[in-house]
Amino acid sequence: MRYSIEKVTTLIGARRIGEADANIGWLLTDSRSLCFPEETLFFALRSERNDGNKYICELYRRGVRNFVVSRVPDGLENYPGANFLKVVDTLEALQRLAERHRDEFGIPVVGITGSNGKTMVKEWLYQLLSPSMVVTRSPKSYNSQIGVPLSVWLLNEQTQVA
């Protein structure tokens, strides 16, 4: 499922800087994981150890044109054809986008909690259910404040259970 950049801007409550048309199919928080730059929306997350804004120039050179930022980079003239979606909190914007995406699907979602064994149980359920239905599951151990929204983004029109 793809969203227009206009729709994403509305869904996350951003102020858009840039006017390029774009359809977003992929979300990115780690510049090392780029696969489809023309359809990617990069969230410049900030943490104690890192600032996603420092990867914008590199990602732009690699073909990404759509960015969610809390701080617009200097020298916008160096980014022709780019869209910057300005928000107060990029993590909150990522979570909000995933929440709105989830609202598009009236399917059952299985949540697994506990201290140990969540990934193993998730994989067992996938093996049990996937022969008879289309299952979308989180890749790896995506169970953090960043991983859950990225997992929810994988839901699509064919998904019967997540």
For each predicted feature, which ranges?
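Phosphate-binding loop of NTP-binding sites
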Residues: 92-162
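N-terminal leader/targeting and accessory segments in enzymes
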Residues: 1-96
